[in-house]
């Protein structure tokens, strides 16, 4: 009698490795807080926190090439076609993209940094521009290196991407620990380089490795045009999404005190760990959804999505309750040198916000896997305007809670209903 082994779905294997990777990454970010505050002090750590917000902005430096390439790979796999030429074309284009953005950052760093870090002019003095430019360079290496991970996820070996990503953050943390225990004096710039540069360098090394393997592959003009045509839509969506999701950093840099900035960023990093778990599932599901869409298996796709949204929302609620009940113990370990005073109202708003994110991010992923971005181009700019105004207005009276309320309002009035409605219309058309 044969014993049939239980076959674990590939997306769950990838998601499982992603969970572990995200836990390690978030663990590194949380563990680093205590050391960084000790080395930099609360005010300089507030500056460090604002600069790390640039990491999300710099995720756009690939011009959407990585996401467009990921979908091409998934489609070629579903049709049993080679996709090597697409990868090589994408890597050529990404090199041009990073050169362009480096020049852009160099030109505009002075103007942007003067406004973004205006509350800390006395602390930074004449170092603002160079600190901002250096941060952009470091985070751009991470943004362009993410193409490597998108290739691996599309090839359904995302566990390799998760392993490399986790390893890179661990190397950064080891560097920070070395500096701390050796008693080496550091500033904000060196702290950023030590902690984050390994993250970009490891992924860039993998890109070089893949390019060497594809050196003999022939590319044509049609490959470049195809990548550019599709990536342009993803780039615009990414840029608009960043404006929406990073408006809070722009607001808190102008509206909140250094102490509140630290409390806000620390709290969001903790909840970022919670949400990382769900985004890991979405990341693993993306190529699966793309293949199901090509095969027109809508019933299976809809069931998968419904289950994920339900479980994701319950998970967020449970984690919010747990973090609130044990907040004193949690924050005494993570940031023992700060006076933590985030209200129950803020915790409730954070829970609501991330439940909304579960819903919206799922449908955004579905539409992107279908290469349908038009509705996002319409709704996301509107969301950015609503979010910016609401956060600016409510933060003046409610502080941290006002920023969170503004975020919730921006989602509720736009993408919360617009994305699922658009998906249903597209799915019914087949």
From Swiss-Prot:
InterPro entries: Poly_Biosynth_Transport (IPR050833)
Pathway membership: Bacterial outer membrane biogenesis; LPS O-antigen biosynthesis
Protein's organism: Salmonella typhimurium (strain LT2 / SGSC1412 / ATCC 700720)
Protein name as it appears in the record: Putative O-antigen transporter
Function description: May be involved in the translocation process of the nascent O-polysaccharide molecules and/or its ligation to lipid A core units.
Membrane topology annotation: Multi-pass membrane protein
Annotated TM spans: 23-39, 45-61, 96-112, 131-147, 163-179, 192-208, 236-252, 266-282, 309-325, 342-358, 373-389, 400-416
Domain of life of the native organism: Bacteria
Subcellular location: Cell inner membrane
PANTHER family with a match to the protein in the record: O-ANTIGEN TRANSPORTER-RELATED, PST FAMILY PREDICTED COLANIC ACID TRANSPORTER
Gene giving rise to this polypeptide: rfbX
Cellular component annotations (GO), alphabetically ordered: plasma membrane
Gene Ontology BP term (one): O antigen biosynthetic process
Annotated keywords: Cell inner membrane, Cell membrane, Lipopolysaccharide biosynthesis, Membrane, Transmembrane, Transmembrane helix, Transport
Main localization category: membrane
């Amino acid at each position: 009698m044969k014993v049939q082994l239980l076959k674990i779905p590939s997306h769950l294997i990838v998601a499982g490795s992603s969970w572990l990777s995200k836990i390690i990454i978030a663990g590194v970010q949380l563990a680093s807080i205590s050391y960084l505050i000790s080395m930099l002090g609360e005010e300089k750590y507030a500056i460090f926190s604002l600069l790390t917000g640039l990491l999300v902005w710099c995720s756009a430096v690939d011009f959407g090439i990585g996401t467009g390439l990921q979908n091409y790979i998934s489609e070629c796999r579903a049709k049993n076609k080679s996709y090597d030429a697409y990868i090589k074309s994408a890597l050529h284009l990404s090199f041009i993209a990073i050169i362009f953005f480096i020049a852009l950052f160099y030109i505009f760093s002075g103007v942007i940094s003067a406004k973004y870090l205006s509350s800390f002019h006395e602390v930074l003095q004449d170092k603002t521009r160079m600190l901002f430019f250096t941060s952009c360079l470091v985070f751009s290496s991470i943004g362009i290196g993410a193409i490597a991970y998108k290739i691996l996820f599309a090839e359904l070996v995302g566990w390799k991407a998760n392993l490399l990503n986790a390893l890179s953050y661990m190397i950064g943390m080891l560097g920070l620990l070395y500096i701390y225990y050796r008693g080496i004096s550091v500033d904000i710039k060196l702290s950023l380089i030590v902690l984050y540069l390994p993250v970009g360098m490891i992924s860039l090394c993998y890109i070089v490795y893949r390019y060497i393997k594809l050196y003999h592959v022939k590319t044509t003009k049609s490959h470049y045009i195809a990548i550019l045509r599709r990536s342009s839509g993803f780039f615009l969506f990414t840029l608009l999404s960043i404006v929406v999701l990073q408006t809070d950093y722009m607001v808190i840099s102008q509206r909140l005190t250094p102490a509140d900035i630290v409390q806000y960023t620390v709290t969001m990093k903790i909840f970022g760990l919670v949400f990382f778990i769900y985004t890991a599932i979405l990341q693993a599901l993306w190529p699966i959804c793309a293949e199901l869409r090509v095969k027109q298996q809508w019933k299976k796709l809809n069931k998968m999505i419904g289950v994920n949204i339900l479980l994701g929302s319950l998970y967020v609620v449970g984690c919010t309750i747990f973090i609130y009940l044990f907040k004193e113990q949690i924050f005494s370990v993570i940031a023992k040198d700060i006076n933590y005073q985030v209200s129950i109202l803020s915790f409730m708003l954070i829970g609501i916000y991330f439940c909304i994110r579960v819903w919206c991010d799922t449908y955004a992923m579905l539409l992107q896997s279908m290469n349908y971005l038009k509705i996002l181009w319409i709704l996301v700019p509107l969301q950015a305007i609503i979010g910016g105004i609401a956060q600016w207005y409510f933060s003046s009276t409610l502080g941290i809670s006002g920023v969170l309320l503004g975020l919730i309002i921006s989602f509720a009035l736009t993408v919360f209903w617009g994305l699922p409605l658009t998906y249903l219309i597209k799915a019914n058309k087949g």
